[in-house]
């Protein structure tokens, strides 16, 4: 993922938490809000409550890969934050992928939802 397409600032995350739309499922919480760029910017939150550094990095890598594979199906021009929940630690990849996509559909981020 490109460096400029990643949310890094605390203010960006807080703006999404307070003013963005959200979708919740057992695996993750997805927040989104329109941005002024023509591309999506993505941020991940994986709490230390989920486990040590190895576990958190594994969850982060899985979430990044899920987004990378689903990106062609998503509309552009959004800030998206994915907050991992405890089920992500031992959850199956396919279920994580399905829950991410269903959250995106609920938020209207998919191209088919826009049509």
PLM-predicted stretches and their roles:
Residues 1-115:
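Positively charged, solvent-exposed patches that mediate nucleic-acid binding
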């Amino acid at each position: 993922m490109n460096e400029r397409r990643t949310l890094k600032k605390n203010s960006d995350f807080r703006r999404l938490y307070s003013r963005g739309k959200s979708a919740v499922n057992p695996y993750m919480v997805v927040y989104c809000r329109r941005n002024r760029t023509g591309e999506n910017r993505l941020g991940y939150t994986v709490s230390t409550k989920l486990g040590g550094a190895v576990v958190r990095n594994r969850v982060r890598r899985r979430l990044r890969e899920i987004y990378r594979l689903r990106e062609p199906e998503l509309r552009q021009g959004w800030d998206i934050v994915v907050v991992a929940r405890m089920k992500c630690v031992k959850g199956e990849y396919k279920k994580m992928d399905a829950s991410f996509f269903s959250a995106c559909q609920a938020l209207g981020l998919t191209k088919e939802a826009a049509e």
